Amino acid sequence: MAEARLLRRRRLCLAVPFVWVVAVAVSRVGANTEGDALYSLRQSLKDANNVLQSWDPTLVNPCTWFHVTCNPDNSVIRVDLGNAQLSGALVPQLGQLKNLQYLELYSNNISGTIPNELGNLTNLVSLDLYLNNFTGFIPETLGQLYKLRFLRLNNNSLSGSIPKSLTNITTLQVLDLSNNNLSGEVPSTGSFSLFTPISFANNKDLCGPGTTKPCPGAPPFSPPPPFNPPTPTVSQGDSKTGAIAGGVAAAAALLFAVPAIGFAWWRRRKPEEHFFDVPAEEDPEVHLGQLKRFSLRELQVATDNFSNKNILGRGGFGKVYKGRLADGSLVAVKRLKEERTPGGELQFQTEVEMISMAVHRNLLRLRGFCMTPTERLLVYPYMANGSVASRLRERQPNDPPLEWQTRTRIALGSARGLSYLHDHCDPKIIHRDVKAANILLDEDFEAVVGDFGLAKLMDYKDTHVTTAVRGTIGHIAPEYLSTGKSSEKTDVFGYGIMLLELITGQRAFDLARLANDDDVMLLDWVKGLLKEKKVEMLVDPDLQSGFVEHEVESLIQVALLCTQGSPMDRPKMSEVVRMLEGDGLAERWEEWQKVEVVRQEAELAPRHNDWIVDSTYNLRAMELSGPR
């Protein structure tokens, strides 16, 4: 008996290490499979700029590679290779990235077909293959991506018909298949009923209701038949009276319906006039691309006549109201407050169109607008998690503080959104008021840049030279304040201040700091603490010990590079994105330190009472170490 028990114990002791090894192996299988899949992609692509140099197959998993983001379980959830000057072809192994949510390959020179295996990426939220050289058909399997919200395949050479399976994606919000060689009838059911001809433009062989061209053999486009309510049941004794009344009513309805249908048909033949000539109160269903023109009455009903109880916030451009549309969806309605001048309507509409064309997952999508002789309103999706500013400083007692990992995601996401405005919009869009209050948070706490384009929109009554400085004290770049001239580098400055808000949880301008003899400007306050080597005092107390020290230092370095006094010395937002992804920050910081060594002797004493212009003096080189 004793020998038998001893034998069982020995077997158990041998089995436990074996089980542990198997468990470790299993935990790495997913990461290794994903790493192999991404390395296959690297081998298939031509990388002229060595952006994939860090994709090393000898590493345990791909989570340390540049342009790859993983979740806490070390599974790949994001691949960002937009505008990387890549060529070559995609590989079917991409279908093994089971947890992938974002696949961004836009603005490259990738060719070949879109792999059917992408349909296996059932967690995908965004698929952006815009501006490449893809050929062949759109895979039918993409209809399996039931979480997809953002699909851009435009500006390629895709052919064949649009798969009807795509209509089953009920979550789809943004669709662009324009500028391809697609043919056949555009589906009009399911999610496709939301999309208008701009989503399918410049595909000469496409036809159907989603385009401006009817399909061969199909009747001309016509308005839907009028709704006929069911006839109520009447007793036999009233049948004759009902018949007579019904006949009179039918005749009257016909008398009024025929001219109305004819007028509607005539207007459908002239869609180019919809945007400019139709008053919103008379035709709320006018669209510009995917942009809806709402009636004022519709927005009054949605916001309970702009009730104060529905105010979400107030800003330099007006008040924002929470509203609920007739379909039940929640929206944020921005009621612009600028006075109206004659002749501004066309410019307003042009700027609204420009804003609507800026589509990126980190930009707040404009859903619609309303314009009357006395009102200008913009309609956006409602962001349930509010703004970064409200989450940092106005959260409810039951709301947890923003975790450090969430803050770093916000930093990167907002940088990507601003980079898109600067580098991918034509003409480029300068925000001019980048701050934590204008960075919104969606249901997944992803950063969404809001209020972009509004500064230009509100200057439509001015000349081409903008004379008004728009922005918020503490965020305004010194050159913008002194000259009134804005550029993308003024946005970079505001972004740097926003990073400091994320790190510290404090306001960019706060008179309350005077009570402790501190600087009212956040940038000056941060620099003062760094000079005193009190980096730990910078971190938001709400985080307690839940932050990564070297990541805090990296974010501070990026913030200081972004807030340099000279706009020429600040990085571009695209460079900021790369630095946040771990590419080039050490080199840029070292270069900055060398310059500071030269400047040290000439550095002036700090100013304590400069409340308007943020300090542009840089720190001594030794006051913040490089990455550890």
From Swiss-Prot:
It is found in: Cell membrane. ATP binds at residues 312-320, 334. Glycans are attached at residues 109, 120, 133, 155, 168, 181. The chain crosses the membrane at residues 243-263. Residues 306-593 form the Protein kinase domain. The active site is at residue 433. GO terms for cellular component: plasma membrane. It catalyses: L-seryl-[protein] + ATP = O-phospho-L-seryl-[protein] + ADP + H(+); L-threonyl-[protein] + ATP = O-phospho-L-threonyl-[protein] + ADP + H(+). Expressed in flag leaves. Expressed in roots, shoot apex, leaf blades, leaf sheaths, panicles and flowers. Expressed leaves, stems, sheaths and flowers. Its EC number is 2.7.11.1. Residues 1-31 form the signal peptide. It is an enzyme of class 2 (transferase). Coiled coil: none annotated. LRR repeats lie at residues 97-121, 123-144, 145-169, 170-194. InterPro entries: Kinase-like_dom_sf, LRR_dom_sf, LRR_N_plant-typ, LRR_R13L4/SHOC2-like, Prot_kinase_dom, Protein_kinase_ATP_BS, Ser-Thr/Tyr_kinase_cat_dom, Ser/Thr_kinase_AS. This is LRR receptor kinase SERK2. One of its GO terms (molecular function) is protein serine/threonine kinase activity. Autophosphorylated on serine and threonine residues. It comes from Oryza sativa subsp. japonica.
